[in-house]
Amino acid sequence: MSSTLHRHIIWESDGLVAYLHPRPWTPGSVILERSTSGSPGGSIFHLQESEYLSWMLGARTVAKLLCDRLGVRRCALVSRPHRDRPAQIRVLPLHGLDAEWRPHLAGEEEYNAHDPAYCTSKSAPRWNDSSLTEIQNKIRAKLPSPDAPPNLTFLGVDPTHPGLFSRIVRGEEQQWRVWDDEGHVAFLTPFPNSPGFTVLVPRRPLTSDIFKLDKEDYEGLVLATWKVSQLLEKGLGAWGIGLIFEGFEIDYAHAKLIPLFLPPSGVEGDITTPPSPQFCATYPGYVTSEDGPEASLENLKEMHIKITLI
């Protein structure tokens, strides 16, 4: 965490503080964390459920503030656990979007068998079915009833809604489901950039702009995400789980959960060194937890005024 003297705070509430990232990957990137310094080694998924929910509601408020003040149409969320600093959420304004939703895809694929020291939403080459089934079985083995049949209830107004996620919920598409409850379904993506990359969706079509969901729908989705994160850690032996809200591959609310694994040696120093800092003035079709180049004090002050000046 940056020192208090150098933080450009844009929002504070209930023990949380949000401030401009001094090394933004995109303009106006914000870090949300506890107001007081916590112990190093933090993940939002290791918070108590009630505290986790308060963090996620805080992120929703910050996203609305950024949309209003920066004139962006939506924000993304990225949270990667850290072994050397407290838990954080990053709220990223997505610049350059059209008024109407259309798919945006990253220009390149990326796969990391072990934690590369960041989380990204980039896709990777398709896994074969047997490898996906092997991962699915590892995860489901930690369920109370691993062999229970899937619940194929679909809650959309149109019972034949044609979207991919709707068809997955109804069991009409090949899938590697790892968890479900009355309101949500979690399944492996066949294009994972990390083993066990999981997508969580509600049982009815909702906007892919998660921060604009009704409060009840938002709370339901983020609490289901917390539950699935616990399952993935236990089932796969991941040291942590990353989280991304983005919504530009499919226009249907979904959370992305990314298991992170240490190299076989278990030596943290073996983790891949992140690439050189990148800065994206407009949304490039993916988001990442990577830091960008250091922002100038003048730029941070200008951004701070734009967000906080009423």
Q: What label would you give each PLM region?
A:
Residues M1-I310:
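HIT superfamily nucleotide-processing domains
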